[in-house]
Amino acid sequence: MNGVAAIAKGMATTLKVLFRKPVTVDYPYVKRPRAPRFRGRHELRTYENGLEMCVGCELCQVACPAAAITVQAAENDPDNPHSPGERYGYKYQVDLLRCIFCGMCEEACPTDCLHLTQEFELADFTRESLILQKEQLVNRNPSGFKVPMNVYPPFRRKAVNA
């Protein structure tokens, strides 16, 4: 009698789940929404006037627990500036093979130039293409970033309603 009850219980569970809406989606044609705080591909932001927000402080490199970020700073040329500061990120490299997408680099950035986007489709055929150089990271189409008044404007983090 004990075995019959177990089979009946299992069949009841099967029938209950059978008529539910399926959890799977027809990806890539139908995409599920991501969480608002999802962290994906890295992006370096620029100001509206084209200057890079990165001042080459290397704090993102220091904060990265996986050592996935490499930054080399160079002195800024006053005649042809790259950023509003004295220095700029001459070489900026993110190794997506090492990155754990924790967001510590984003939090460490004093100018708020480093941003983790919602982009998550990062698969590729070669390992070299997953090491992103500065040219691949810089977003030349800024939206809402004003011309800097000074090198380190007082950025404030907004609280996210959880």
UniProtKB/Swiss-Prot annotation:
InterPro entries documented for this protein: 4Fe4S_Fe-S-bd, 4Fe4S_Fe_S_CS, NADH_quinone_OxRdtase_chainI
Catalytic activity: a quinone + NADH + 5 H(+)(in) = a quinol + NAD(+) + 4 H(+)(out)
Molecular function terms, GO-annotated: 4 iron, 4 sulfur cluster binding; iron ion binding; NADH:ubiquinone reductase (non-electrogenic) activity; quinone binding
Cofactor(s) it depends on: [4Fe-4S] cluster
4Fe-4S ferredoxin-type domain mapped to chain residues: 44-74, 90-119
Binding site for [4Fe-4S] cluster 1: C54, C57, C60, C109
EC number: 7.1.1.-
Localisation: Cell membrane
Source species, domain of life: Bacteria
Gene Ontology biological process: aerobic respiration
Protein name stated in the entry: NADH-quinone oxidoreductase subunit I 1
Upper classification of the organism: Bacteria, Bacillati, Bacillota, Clostridia, Eubacteriales
Gene: nuoI1
